[in-house]
Amino acid sequence: MDRPLSSSAEAEEELEWQVASRRRKAWAKCRSSWQASETEDLSTEATTQDEEEDEEEDLPGAQLPAAGGRGNVPNEKIAIWLKDCRTPLGASLDEQSSSTLKGVLVRNGGSFEDDLSLGAEANHLHESDAQIENCNNILAKERRLQFHQKGRSMNSTGSGKSSGTVSSVSELLELYEEDPEEILYNLGFGRDEPDIASKIPSRFFNSSSFAKGIDIKVFLSAQMQRMEVENPNYALTSRFRQIEVLTTVANAFSSLYSQVSGTPLQRIGSMSSVTSNKETDPPPPLTRSNTANRLMKTLSKLNLCVDKTEKGESSSPSPSAEKGKILNVSVIEESGNKNDQKSQKIMKKKESSSMLATVKEEVSGSSAAVTENADSDRISDEANSNFNQGTENEQSKETQSHESKLGEESGIVESKLDSDFNISSHSELENSSELKSVHISTPEKEPCAPLTIPSIRNIMTQQKDSFEMEEVQSTEGEAPHVPATYQLGLTKSKRDHLLRTASQHSDSSGFAEDSTDCLSLNHLQVQESLQAMGSSADSCDSETTVTSLGEDLATPTAQDQPYFNESEEESLVPLQKGLEKAAAVADKRKSGSQDFPQCNTIENTGTKQSTCSPGDHIIEITEVEEDLFPAETVELLREASAESDVGKSSESEFTQYTTHHILKSLASIEAKCSDMSSENTTGPPSSMDRVNTALQRAQMKVCSLSNQRMGRSLLKSKDLLKQRYLFAKAGYPLRRSQSLPTTLLSPVRVVSSVNVRLSPGKETRCSPPSFTYKYTPEEEQELEKRVMEHDGQSLVKSTIFISPSSVKKEEAPQSEAPRVEECHHGRTPTCSRLAPPPMSQSTCSLHSIHSEWQERPLCEHTRTLSTHSVPNISGATCSAFASPFGCPYSHRHATYPYRVCSVNPPSAIEMQLRRVLHDIRNSLQNLSQYPMMRGPDPAAAPYSTQKSSVLPLYENTFQELQVMRRSLNLFRTQMMDLELAMLRQQTMVYHHMTEEERFEVDQLQGLRNSVRMELQDLELQLEERLLGLEEQLRAVRMPSPFRSSALMGMCGSRSADNLSCPSPLNVMEPVTELMQEQSYLKSELGLGLGEMGFEIPPGESSESVFSQATSESSSVCSGPSHANRRTGVPSTASVGKSKTPLVARKKVFRASVALTPTAPSRTGSVQTPPDLESSEEVDAAEGAPEVVGPKSEVEEGHGKLPSMPAAEEMHKNVEQDELQQVIREIKESIVGEIRREIVSGLLAAVSSSKASNSKQDYH
């Protein structure tokens, strides 16, 4: 006993320090060395020692026999358990320390500090007597219950403090003194339940998630909201909380998608206040819903998350859309004949309705009732759709309030659901009614929409009023097929809302769980059918709302079309041509968006029967258009936007499907406007008049759009194409639809208005959602004027930026030729005038690129920024979509922030800017964590094969950092240019702005300043890191002058892309090249680019030219297309230019600031400078065309010089001064870099000798 006593005394003396340190070491070893071999060896030794020590040290304690028993049996169990955990070492050491610790704890109550490991704790706990364990287990349960009653969760303590056998802290407390924090918590001090964030290390919150679209704050808030919503105690309030949760989630996802797609989310910021704003602020719901649909469309077009977004979020809209889509899709896919399509539609309608239980009843009931109430149902449905579409104000108020509630509550989905449901129910009603009384549906649709608009307005109002309550009830009230058309439309729309909401947010919302079930089934089936359709189906999903309107209608139209044609001929004979044209346009959009088969059918709008579903959709669209025709301009604009959407969708595949939906939505929106105008009128006559006028305008729109779609053969009717072409030339190319129409019918409509079709090359450009742009080469000037007029007149506060050059699509080459023609039409590209591409693009980069920052390496973020949101995406279409969507958003916000502020809550812009700030700060944090070369001796590192092998990585890092820095510099310059242009534009309208708008302008200005400052800080950090990396690379790269040139060549070639020279030996050559480059840049910047830009309006030209000069001359991460986009010159402005955009689309050039040949063009040299050998070697082949392209552009600018007005001459002088300043700054920066290169090279040479000496020392 003496020995044990002495050992126990020693152990007691050791315990608090040595034992703790020993346990720490053991735990560290367990953690660090997971190899079984090491741990087993150590564990065996330690186990033997531990058992001895356990026996010896436990003897003196009061628990000697128990300790001895534990030393044998429990330790074995622990060892087995630890072996299972692959921590035998920890087990043995833990046993060793735990036995002593246990004795000490029992005796001294000493604290083991915080280094108790699971293994150690497990050992210690297992050591406790079996009786104690049993008692502890019982106590654990009781105390666990007590703790739970107290609101304390034993999860963290139990998992952290106990092995697995001990389940509660109370058990541990009996064994030893608990952690003081736990004791205090148990005693009631502090919060009973520490904040979740307090238990999560701050490192998880310091930087945003690298995953795509993950925001921890949004996630946590959504989880908390969901917990609250799911709490049964909330009862009724939980429903409304669900709405809020849905709104929040939808807002978050919308913002995320807007970042990805670059589309503006105008109402996202007001989502929280949407509940109050829903009724009062219908436009925000429109914006939000439109944003959601637009985002889905954009995503489907971009193919970024087509399956996920469309099937995930659009899945909720798909129920109604699924009806129409399944019907349409199945009809389109399965139906060979209209009759077959009709029967299939009927069958599928029934199937889809059965799939959608609520909708089924509604559909079946509506179809049954539609036979009787076909007119009323269709009127009600159509009134719902048309009310949604037609009563813009009322619907925007009621429907938007209703839908905004839904859209905001259920997020984007519900607004879609309303419109979709109305559309789908309408289409279903139309299907049934059209099947039964097609003629009625068609003629009555037209009159009914206006007639039913008031009643529907009431119905919609009822829906709106009862929506939140009925939102829950909407799933319950599945008897919407009640004879009351209102109820049908309402219940259907509500059910659709609920269905969509349920499908999208079934977890959190629980709105229409039944509906959700139906939705999920239907949605799945629909998605399957849509999947069969392909991306068009996806787009259909995302655009279900519009699709339901268009496709559902189209689906019944198959049956209804012949009748409709008849009825149309009967009631719309005079309008038939216009309707056919409008239908052709709608069909065009629809077919373009849905399918080319449908497009063909639509093309045969004259023979609308050819494709029943497209025709029907066209018919309905026509009717909607008829209703909308009072808002013909808007409708046309939106149709044009829809057409541009169709063009985009057709370009991107079946996105066209979405387009036609959008078209219809636009038509519905316009119909709403027209309904507003003829709200009280029965509408059949007014709808007819509207149809006549609207059809004419639609024809004009179609013509303008047809120019763009000429090659699409969407409309086969040559008359329509010719007329559209003529109309396009007639000056209808640019129409501005009113700012986002009501959300209910089609958020997509807003999307439609957002889309801008640029040139006949099918290139589509997304402009701010409020605008629909028809882009025809000859009309661009008129469009500019009109756009300016529209901007001045319309309340829409987005600017029309039609920069064909900004559209970067694979089809761009095709459209480049027409663009060249446009440029040759004698007018400067309107794009540059309307919206300085640099502005739009830098803004784009602000919004769309920053959204991608988290997904990409920091260097790539800056790269994309500099390239104006031309991400390093291999797919040209992706980048094309990204830029158009991003640019328009930036356009409207950047150029006309005041407008954006007035119409759209500044929150959207602020959110974008704040996101940019957040991303920049994240980039700063990430940069601070950016891996630097780590090595005990960087100088000697090159001599180790491992280091040399890693060197290329650091070289790439160095290059990327340089590229990032230059990109940031360029981006910041572009931001400044944008701000200058914005300020110039604002000065003209600032005195017209309201106080709120001015406040928003000031606020946005502050945000932009913050962004610029953050960018500057980021540049500084990048510069510092570059210097550090450069030093390390130099040391590694040139350990000694005798070092083999292979390593230097490897490193140097990689860094050649950077201004840094691979080695001091090559410094002079790059220096000479840099000086020559600067001379070229000076001459070209001062003369060519400055003069080029002066064609652009001074406010914008200076910025665009300035930024272009900087970007092109410095060639900061910019390809030739970058310059083109910057200048806003169509990508085909010159033959050389047309080549460069293609190259840019194919690759994103990463070039040093002044070294890349992408500078306007050095007339004589097509060769890339030697320092471009590195990463530019790949691009060398493209470098020549780039050089030629900018050169041609510069020459073109010179050629245009003579035509510049005197005022522009003066402005030119100012620009010249600015350009001279830029040149000086560039020269200074280059000279400084060259000096740093030389100095660093010399230092490297010196350090290399030292390195060789040190190497000798080491070896």
Swiss-Prot record:
Signal peptide: none annotated. The keyword Lyase does not apply. Induction: Up-regulated by activated KRAS. It is found in: Cytoplasm. Residues 268-277, 382-393, 1101-1118, 1158-1168 have a biased composition (Polar residues). Disulfide bonds: none annotated. GO terms for cellular component: cytosol; nucleoplasm; plasma membrane. A 33 kDa peptide corresponding to the C-terminus of this protein is found in the testis and seems to be cleaved into 2 peptides of 14 kDa and 18 kDa found on the surface of mature sperm cells. This sperm surface antigen may be involved in some step of early cleavage of the fertilized oocyte. The keyword Phosphoprotein applies. The modification Phosphoserine is found at residues 92, 111, 209, 270, 330, 466, 644, 668, 737, 739, 746, 759, 767, 803, 869, 902, 1040, 1055, 1060, 1063, 1118, 1134, 1161. SMART domains: KRAP_IP3R_bind. Keywords: Actin-binding, Coiled coil, Cytoplasm, Isopeptide bond, Phosphoprotein, Ubl conjugation. The modification Phosphothreonine is found at residues 87, 1156, 1168. GO terms for molecular function: actin filament binding; signaling receptor binding. Residues 424-435 have a biased composition (Low complexity). Strongly expressed in pancreas and testis. Present in colon cancer cells (at protein level). There is a cross-link at residues 360, 808 (Glycyl lysine isopeptide (Lys-Gly) (interchain with G-Cter in SUMO2)). Residues 394-408, 807-825 have a biased composition (Basic and acidic residues). Residues 38-59 have a biased composition (Acidic residues). Residues 31-72, 268-290, 306-450, 806-829, 1094-1137, 1154-1215 are annotated as: Disordered. Residues 959-1037 form a coiled coil. Its main location: cytoplasm. This is Protein ITPRID2. It comes from Homo sapiens (Human). The gene is ITPRID2.
